Amino acid sequence: MVDFKMTKEGLVLLIKDYQNLEEVLNAISARITQMGGFFAKGDRISLMIENHNKHSQDIPRIVSHLRNLGLEVSQILVGSTVEGKENDLKVQSRTTVESTGKVIKRNIRSGQTVVHSGDVIVFGNVNKGAEILAGGSVVVFGKAQGNIRAGLNEGGQAVVAALDLQTSLIQIAGFITHSKGEENVPSIAHVKGNRIVIEPFDKVSFERSE
């Protein structure tokens, strides 16, 4: 299910396609324990998950789990192993895990991915080609483009807000939209009536939770 591979990309944690995230987390812990003193605290690795799009919502929990075990994820790879050559990877794309802190005081550039298990606040822009994976809500004090996935731990109560919400994709829990907010108008995306709606900040009407 999980294994570490030494490749030209460096040390990669390869996670096969799976059905149960808890089983994956337990397998990671067991594999690291089995490897004894191979790792030192703070060692950096790459992460590749087969069927990446299916499991992208699990990345914050996996990254957080690895951090609790003393390992830092430096980049996320999208691709697969080469048949007959287990230590060779066919990498389709790679993104740098730029920050795991919840307050970011800079622009998030194309090719960078921010992963955090809670809320993420960005004082800057999120450029096209960038991605945020957040367990909670995402608030951008700037222009938000690229992909923003929120509520991956918190669920449908999470929101995505920006001074200019021009994202390529917004995901909140299991809901996805490619809609954008009104240009240059502070807006909030939230789940309402089992879909994501985007409303101006001064006109937002949240769905009441029971």
UniProtKB/Swiss-Prot annotation:
This is Probable septum site-determining protein MinC. Disulfide bonds: none annotated. Gene3D superfamilies: 2.160.20.70, Cell-division inhibitor MinC, N-terminal domain. Interacts with MinD and FtsZ. Belongs to the MinC family. InterPro entries: CAP/MinC_C (IPR016098), MinC (IPR013033), MinC_C_sf (IPR036145), MinC_N (IPR007874), Septum_form_inhib_MinC_C (IPR005526). It holds the Pfam family MinC_C. Keywords: Cell cycle, Cell division, Septation. Cell division inhibitor that blocks the formation of polar Z ring septums. Rapidly oscillates between the poles of the cell to destabilize FtsZ filaments that have formed before they mature into polar Z rings. Prevents FtsZ polymerization. The gene is minC. One of its GO terms (biological process) is division septum assembly.
